[in-house]
């Protein structure tokens, strides 16, 4: 995602305060924050990405746990958003292969299909609710709260990448 505001949210309110670092992602999606490792949360707002047809699409807000070491790389994706909302999903996503929950889902070197299935399910549900003239979720806050509900629903599933689990989690997460 390029052009996204990336916030190191210390107090969890999703709003930048004077003591919170913020940066903007560049054309490759990279960003730099001047923040010590800690118990804060990464939150994005705005930005765009190219879909599979090369069309520019507005990005959804996402989040990720703070890096645990200084200078660490942290991806911010639908997968990290699930883990930020429900840390118990780390183990389930890691079991799906590759870099697990912190996978770069846009990597040209590939990502395990099971991880992509989960990421795409989350993204498709969120896009369906957030785009178009009849969008149900219009604020970043409402979108992030819905991501939290989806994370809790995914955490209740045994095999989170199966068709049945994806359907059950997305249905339960929207109730």
Where are these regions (language model features)?
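Feature for extracytoplasmic/surface-facing segments of secreted or surface-associated proteins
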Residues: 1-175
